[in-house]
Amino acid sequence: WRPEWAASSPLFNPIRWLNQHTPPDRWPDQNDYDSLAKLQQQVPGIRFVLPENLPDTGEYYETRIHRSGKVPTRANNWHDFFNAAVWLTFPLSKQALNQRHILGQQHSDSRGRGPLRDAATLLDESGIVVAYCDDTLAQLLRQHEWQQLFVARRSQWGRTISAITFGHAIY
């Protein structure tokens, strides 16, 4: 466990608040995550559970969460820590994303993921949310005008446009 993770990069800004609510000397455990979920009070019924404490039902990962509210969360694991962090920071977005997976399953004619679930998985694992209030900047982004967006308009970042890490696999 590295308690200094939160200060090591601005990438962690959206989830940095967790560092003030988790033990400094050890990995957070399922009880810590559940206490934070209750503190957030946005998605009732979500719990973080060790995978070995869940019966093997043969369900997709997302189906289990949708049906039971139990998010499989391995102990002492950065990937699952960051997944829990995103659930705790953006609970309504994660719930909506989980619902997209369920819709994708219902509209798929095979056991494969399909395009809707593929897109949901990409956002969940490696997504960046770009929030903006200046349409010109959004247009520069869409047109891949990187020099204009990132260099000429650098002063706008953090003021009228922001990139927020959402995908837990890229933290």
What are these regions (language model features)?
Residues 1-68, 159-171:
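The feature captures two recurrent sequence modes
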Residues 10-21, 80-92, 121-125:
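Short, hydrophobic/amphipathic alpha-helical patches that form generic packing surfaces
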Residues 21, 36-39, 64, 85, ...:
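Residues that form generic nucleotide/phosphate-binding pockets
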Residues 50-51, 84, 132-133:
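Short His-Asn-centered micro-motif
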Residues 54, 88-92, 129, 147:
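Short loop/turn segments at secondary-structure transitions that flank enzyme active sites
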Residues 59, 76-84, 117-120, 135:
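Non-catalytic, well-ordered alpha-helical scaffold segments
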Residues 69-107:
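Hydrophobic alpha-helical segments and helix pairs
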Residues 103-171:
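A contiguous, surface-oriented mixed alpha/beta subdomain in the mid-to-C-terminal portion of proteins
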